[in-house]
Curated annotation (Swiss-Prot):
Keyword Membrane found: yes
GO CC terms: plasma membrane
Reaction(s) catalysed (UniProt annotation): phosphonate(out) + ATP + H2O = phosphonate(in) + ADP + phosphate + H(+)
Protein's job: Part of the ABC transporter complex PhnCDE involved in phosphonates import. Responsible for energy coupling to the transport system.
SMART domains xrefs: AAA
Record-given protein name: Phosphonates import ATP-binding protein PhnC 1
Classification lineage: Bacteria, Pseudomonadati, Pseudomonadota, Alphaproteobacteria, Hyphomicrobiales
CDD domains from the UniProt entry: ABC_PhnC_transporter
Enzyme Commission identifier(s): 7.3.2.2
Cross-referenced InterPro entries: AAA+_ATPase (IPR003593), ABC_transporter-like_ATP-bd (IPR003439), ABC_transporter-like_CS (IPR017871), ABC_transpr_PhnC (IPR012693), MetN_ABC_transporter-like (IPR050086), P-loop_NTPase (IPR027417)
Length: 270
């Protein structure tokens, strides 16, 4: 279980995240929602320790993540794989090598420098690409792919880290509707098929309701909603987005055909 206790991140006098507290059961698909500047990205970066908390604690299976340093911190970053809005691929390298970068914490640095990856890691990378119909692009340069294809490569890279948690920071923000669905289906697959916990920052409530079994809503750095998608009221929607409710709440879409419907969690409004 992931437990967040009073997590705060300040930049000068401004709190980007202010006293966030929640817990996440293993195997959950949690959407973190709210308008731009609500603190969603900072929250996920703190969970991975790319951003340092000013106050509070992050616990995972009893381990104090906020106290980790050195090799233990690098291991945690491998266990909590990040997926970024801008993909963070190396364009001049081929797709397979980009995916193998997810194994850096497990191999000596000289192997990656001379591109001598162990055969078992290469097989793992090809298998991960195959999960998202990208194995045929293994030898192609990453910068020759579409945005949706690049994001699927980034998800495959996260998968080869063999993580406990995937932290997806606005993974579909720059994608068209078709590629948005492909990428969200890929995230749902690693959650349902591999049992990996997913925390995904999303701006769209319709997508969040379709794919997530739980929502954490943020406004001005604070958690103001934590519960099932069906429990998101007009009042909470207005607080999250500072808009009229009918501008942000639509009819919930269905989970993609062939994938199990998520179970609803309980509701707690902070």
């Amino acid at each position: 279980m992931l437990v967040v206790e009073g997590l705060t991140c300040r930049f000068g006098s401004k709190a980007a995240v202010d006293g966030a507290s929640f817990s996440v059961e293993r195997g959950s698909f949690v959407g973190v929602i709210g308008r731009s500047g609500a603190g969603k990205s900072t929250l996920l970066r703190m969970l991975n320790r790319l951003a340092e908390p000013s106050e509070g604690r992050i616990l995972f299976e009893g381990i104090d993540v906020t106290a980790l340093q050195g090799r233990e911190l690098r291991q945690w970053r491998a266990r909590s794989a990040m997926i970024f809005q801008q993909f963070n691929l190396i364009g001049r390298l081929d797709v397979l090598t980009n995916v193998l970068m997810g194994r850096l914490s497990e191999v000596p640095s000289w192997r990656s420098l001379v591109q001598m990856w162990p055969e078992q890691d290469r097989a793992l990378a090809i298998s991960a690409l195959d999960q998202f119909d990208m194995a045929s692009y293994a030898a192609q340069r990453a910068d020759q792919l579409s945005g949706g294809q690049q994001q699927r490569v980034a998800i495959a890279r996260a998968l080869v880290q063999q993580p406990d948690i995937v932290l997806a920071d606005e993974p579909i923000a720059s994608l068209d509707p078709r590629n948005t669905k492909i990428v969200m289906d890929a995230l749902l697959r690693i959650n349902k098929h591999f049992g990996i916990t997913v925390l995904c920052n999303l701006h769209s409530l319709d997508l969040a309701r379709s794919y997530c079994d739980r929502l954490i809503g943020m406004a001005s750095g604070r958690v103001v909603f934590d519960g099932a998608p069906a429990a998101l009221t007009d009042q909470i929607a207005r607080e999250l987005y500072d808009l009229e409710a009918d501008e942000v709440l639509g009819t919930a879409s269905h989970v993609p055909h062939g994938l199990p419907a998520p179970a609803l969690a309980g509701v707690a409004v902070a």
